[in-house]
Amino acid sequence: MKLLYIFSFIFFLSTQALAGQGDTTSYIQVVDVYSGKMDTILAFKGHVEAPNWHRDNYLIVNSYGKLYTIDLKSRKMTLLNTGTAQSCNNDHLISPDGKWLGISNTDANDTSTKLNKSIIYIMPINGGQPRRVTPSIPSYLHGWSPDGKTLIYCAERNGDYDVYAIPVEGGTEKRITTTEGLDDGPEYSADGKHIYFNSYRSGHMHIWRMLADGSQPEQLTFDENSNWFAHPSPNNQSIVYMAYTSDEKQQHLFGKDVKLRLMDLKTKKIRDLTPVFFGGQGTINVPSWSADSRKLAFVSYKVN
């Protein structure tokens, strides 16, 4: 939720209003990447976004600025205590050891964020008061290094959206990409050697990867879809990403025809993981693989 932020924020408010009237239904779903079988975990009357999958078999999702857990056995949705962070967006993720949660939130009491700009925080996985990490705004969290030491994120600095890195403890951020056009959704590979991301540098939104220091960028997709948010599997064998079936330029909108696609990282072959469905913003913004690399969580929608 970062490109054309003012537009996205207005749009978010409009979808919130719709959902408050019961017009939006969010379907939290799981797909098996081997069999293709899909299971609807929960149908929620309202807007839910961006599932993470914890190794203890529950999901973490966003809904209207708050975070919730969804137990995959009981399918119960429970509010997560995020302290003073009450305006979270859909860029959040779980630390490699499963003990911490990174979140992106707008602090209404912080005068530096009066334009509704996002800050990255870290908090205990079971809830608590978040600790601020990024000094500059806006910053949108997407990746956590396998050694647990570094966060990577999309950030707007001087009008350019690029990939940045910062120590988990905070400090000075490092710019990783410098090309024109949006670079978004950065995530580390399981071995920490690569960063996968989506970029408009070619004039079309595609999936790319680079070495962790930003060198040797490599384009991975070449079709006519608008391809967003590559999520490397824990076993480092594949990536899943979301494809808009139409050219959306640099926009990542809700309410579009999309599908999930799977790329084999050894052969670079790509196949559809799901049929086309109604989704987009909120569907799979953040990593949502199960620990065994067999399943993925995502959200599809219906607006009445």
Question: Which residues fall in each region the model found?
Answer:
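A detector of repeated loop/turn-to-beta-strand junctions in beta-rich toroidal repeat architectures
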Residues: 25-27, 117-119, 160-162, 204-206, ...
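Multi-bladed beta-propeller domains
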Residues: 30-47, 72-88, 123-138, 167-182, ...
